[in-house]
Structures are given as C-alpha cells and as structure tokens.
Amino acid sequence: TNGLSSDRGFTTPDVREADIKNFAMRRCAKKFVLCDSSKFNKISKATFAAGSDITVITDKITENIKGYNIKEAAQL
C-alpha cells in the first residue's frame, strides 16, 4: 500500500492497481496488508480497501493506529 488513513482506508496512486487489489480483497477469507509506518496518515489517489476486516503487518505500531479502524495490527 502507498497510504493508510482513517478517512480513506488503504490507498494507492494507480487506479488499475487499486482495482486489482480490491478484486483480490473481495475474494479473501483473511486479509493482510504490509504497511510500513511511514505510510500512516498518507492518502493516495485510489482506495482499494477499508480497514475494518484487515490485519496490518507493520514495522512499528504507533498510538494512532487504533484510529484507522483496522481489525488488528502486528509488528515485525
């Protein structure tokens, strides 16, 4: 992902890429997104997923990650 925000969810600058990611997300029983902490509070052009049913795997869990309405966060 290129961005994660509380307003827009997971975003990417490429609309076609967002369509493919959205298509894949709709077909997954469990959803995981790799997102380093530099992408928090960033917004790109196209949203491909909301956070409510996604587990985020990240390098650093920050205090404000709870505001993103994600299912769970895991730190590597």
Q: Where on the chain are the PLM-derived regions?
A:
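Conserved phosphate- and dinucleotide-binding cores of soluble alpha/beta proteins
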Residues: 1-76
